[in-house]
Design a protein with these regions (language model features):
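Cell-envelope/extracellular polymer assembly enzymes that use nucleotide-activated donors
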Residues: 5-7, 38, 187
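Conserved donor nucleotide-binding strand/loop of the catalytic core
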Residues: 37-40, 51-85
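A conserved acidic beta->alpha catalytic loop
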Residues: 43-51, 98
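Acidic helix N-cap motif at the loop->helix transition within catalytic regions
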Residues: 17-21, 48-56
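Acceptor/aglycone-binding surface of glycosyltransferases and processive sugar-polymer synthases
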Residues: 67-85, 90, 102-182, 208-217, ...
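N-proximal low-complexity "stem/linker" segments adjacent to membrane-targeting elements
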Residues: 1-28
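Catalytic donor-sugar/metal-binding loop of nucleotide-sugar-dependent glycosyltransferases
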Residues: 154, 180, 189-205
Length: 238
């Protein structure tokens, strides 16, 4: 029997409420796109029963897999681990709160089919439909402006948790990604652009989900990470 064509990864950390919705919704949408998919839940040291929920699904559906960690690795490191474990030629991931409208999933996967190395949703491109508080909107636009200014990126929105990769392209890049947490999304887009990646960014409909685990300290850490990555690229040549 042929292996999966598409791997979807959902990173989770104490997100039981959102995961209870995300798993059946993911199966529903993916089943319309391909019958050759797998769903990996990258469970990052949760203590709220996420692992137990996924194990229940595993017993009923062989396409669902739990990738458990006894301790918290960080979102970026959990995604790296899941990508290495994936069986599909196309690897997607999205946030467990399903903030990005899942009707965009065929477009995300289709972009890789059509030759893109990376595809990413955007809340900031013309044509996007994003609803969030004024403070978060200002912070996001400011952050992405700084990434473009300091790191030379051409992407509108680096932090949208709705991305896909050509596995053959992305695997050799992963060892150069140093961020273990939220900056992972930005670093992978910046570094792959410097490698000449074909990136498809497209506008999405996005609504802030419940129970996001991004904290204020994460925002400050991402700001300092911009400067750290600038130093690595331009000074230490790492």
């Amino acid at each position: 029997m042929a292996g999966p064509e598409v791997t979807v990864v959902i990173p989770v950390y104490n997100d039981l409420y959102s995961l209870e919705i995300a798993i059946p919704r993911s199966i529903e949408i993916l089943s319309r796109i391909t019958d050759r998919f797998e769903l990996i839940i990258a469970e990052d040291g949760s203590t709220d029963g996420c692992a137990e929920l996924v194990r229940q699904y595993e017993q009923r559906d062989t396409r669902i897999h739990l990738l458990h960690s006894d301790e918290r690795l960080g979102r970026g490191k959990a995604l790296n681990r899941a990508i290495y474990e994936s069986g599909g030629n196309i690897i997607c991931y999205y946030d467990v709160d399903l903030a990005t409208d899942m009707q965009h999933l065929p477009e995300l996967i289709g972009a890789i089919h059509e030759g893109a190395d990376i595809a990413t949703g955007s809340r900031l491109m013309p044509g996007s439909d994003s609803v969030r508080t004024g403070g978060r909107e200002i912070a996001s636009r400011s952050y992405n402006f700084l990434v473009r200014l300091f790191l030379g990126s051409r992407i509108y929105d680096h932090q949208c948790g709705f991305k896909a990769f050509n596995k053959e392209y992305i695997l050799p890049i992963l060892p150069s990604i140093h961020s273990n947490h939220w900056f992972w999304d930005t670093e992978i887009l910046v570094r792959t652009q410097r490698h000449g990646a074909r990136i498809c960014e497209f506008p999405v409909r996005w609504r802030a989900g419940k129970g996001t685990t991004v904290k204020i300290k994460d925002v400050f850490e991402m700001g300092s990470s911009i400067l750290r990555l600038w130093w690595q690229i331009h000074v230490s040549k790492n």
